[in-house]
Structures are given as C-alpha cells and as structure tokens.
C-alpha cells in the first residue's frame, strides 16, 4: 500500500491516543502530538473507550494490536471523518506513522510503507546524529536570511530574485550518504 507523505498542523486540534499507560508506543505518540501543539486526550484503558471519546477528534492513534478495536475505530472514522492510525495494522487506518529525525526547525520523515521498520529506525538514528548543533545553526541562519529578503524585497515580482539568493546561500551544503547491507543480501540465492 502506498501512502502520500504529508505533515500536519495539529496546533489546537483534538487528538486521541489509545494505549495503556506503560505502552512505549502510546507514550511516544502522545509526547510527539503534544510537541506539535495538539490538544491530546489519552485513553489508557482501550476497553473503556466510548464512541464519543473519538467522534470529535481530528486525529486518532490506536496502539493496541486489537483487530476488533481497530475495525470499530475504522467504522467511526468513516462516519465522523477523523484521521486514523492503527499502529502495525495499516488496513484499518488512513495514516501511517513515520520515523522522524529532527533538529531545530527541520523534520525529516522516513517511511518504508510498513515493510522494513528497522531500516526506518536506523535511517532516523543516523540522520539524527548527522543533524548536529552546527546543522541547526546553518538552517536557522538560512531562515533568517530568507526573512530579511522577504522584508527587503517583498512581492511576487521579486520571487525569482529571492529564490536565486537562497539557492546561492545554500551553495556548498551537501550530505554524504552511504548504505551498508548485511552479508546475506548479496549472497547468491540457492
């Protein structure tokens, strides 16, 4: 199944996380939603979920691997038009969670369409390590330059000039990417 990658502005929007209090996935998802400015409600006992707990939600993330719960949530999502992610059960949801590498204002989402979550995790860890404090300063300086350009040369008639200046400012930035594969991958099949 192919998903379309997108970033959501969840500031002030009602989001619901379903998962027990010690569920690492639920803890991480609730924290990420709060970091995004969402109004988060956490249902720690999936058995106590009432339909009205999710009907006014914008986005619901369900962490239990419970087919009946996921099917029920899908029916509610279809009826009440909220976004739904059922972790490790993509057939029920509209949203697949990505591995996120972040530094300052930069967010890089990594998706493997559910085929290789470990690969996504490794990519996230390596990118996260590469996006150090110097990288963050560089991006923030570019952002400052962009704001100055927009203030000094506003309007669509200067858009090409602003774009060219930003391309020139980033000239010389590069990322060195290299992949290493396990020994079984290149071994002859037989």
Q: What residue spans do the PLM features occupy?
A:
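Short acidic/histidine-rich motifs immediately flanking catalytic phosphotransfer sites
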Residues: 54-59
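An accessory alpha-helical subdomain
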Residues: 114-190
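Rossmann-fold NAD(P)-binding glycine/threonine-rich loop
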Residues: 67-114
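A short, well-structured beta->alpha microelement
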Residues: 34, 38-52
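Glycine-rich adenosine-cofactor-binding loop
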Residues: 2-31, 138-153, 158, 190
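Glycine-rich, N-terminal phosphate-binding loop of Rossmann-like dinucleotide-binding domains
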Residues: 63-65
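Short, hydrophobic beta-strand segments that form beta-sheet elements in well-ordered domains
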Residues: 16-17, 39-44, 60
């Amino acid at each position: 199944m192919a998903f379309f990658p997108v970033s959501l502005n969840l500031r002030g929007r009602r989001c619901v996380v379903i998962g027990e209090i010690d569920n690492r996935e639920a803890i991480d998802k609730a924290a990420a939603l709060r970091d995004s400015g969402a109004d988060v409600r956490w249902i720690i006992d999936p058995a106590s979920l009432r339909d009205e707990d999710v009907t006014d939600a914008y986005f619901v993330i369900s962490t239990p691997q419970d087919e009946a719960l996921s099917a029920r949530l899908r029916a509610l999502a279809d009826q009440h038009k909220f976004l739904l992610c059922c972790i490790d059960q993509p057939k029920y949801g509209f949203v697949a969670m990505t591995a996120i590498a972040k530094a300052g204002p930069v967010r890089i989402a990594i998706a493997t369409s559910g085929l290789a979550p470990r690969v996504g995790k490794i990519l996230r860890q390596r990118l996260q390590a590469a996006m150090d404090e110097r990288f963050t300063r560089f991006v923030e300086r570019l952002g400052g330059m962009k704001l100055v350009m927009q203030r000094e040369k506003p309007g669509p008639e200067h858009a090409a000039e602003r774009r060219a200046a930003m391309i020139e400012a980033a000239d010389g930035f590069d990322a060195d990417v290299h992949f290493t594969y396990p020994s079984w991958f290149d071994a002859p099949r037989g």
